[in-house]
Amino acid sequence: MIVRTLDECRDSERRVASETWESVRMLLKNDNMGFSFHITTIYQDTETHIHYKNHLESVYCMSGEGEIEVVGGETYPIKPGTLYILDKHDEHYLRAYKDKEMVMACVFNPPITGAEVHDENGVYPVLD
């Protein structure tokens, strides 16, 4: 059995931050569950370009509001209780609105190792 708290993970190397977001990676590839689980905060009044060419992701909004814009497609509002699934390696822009950051629960397949950050194209590489 694996038991971890968000606070424990936040105060460790499992917390990764960039200019527009931070991710607390609670479950990683080396946990051997076949997926990874993160609590990600999208900072207020930001836009992040993301394109997971190597991963599928499902995201559940726990707090805050914003939107996701699929490149070449539609824009969808995000608020608490919204689940979106990037099942086609969808290139997208994730935006948190001015008044509050968004806190999201994220699941990745294949699982990430924990060291990944988005490259210049918004992609996470596949790491062993």
Swiss-Prot record:
Reactions accelerated catalytically: (2S)-4-acetamido-2-aminobutanoate = L-ectoine + H2O
Pfam families per the UniProt record, alphabetical: Ectoine_synth
Residue pairs linked by disulfide bridges in the UniProt entry: none
Known EC number: 4.2.1.108
UniProt superkingdom: Bacteria
First-tier enzyme category under EC: lyase
Protein's UniProt name: L-ectoine synthase
Gene from which the chain derives: ectC
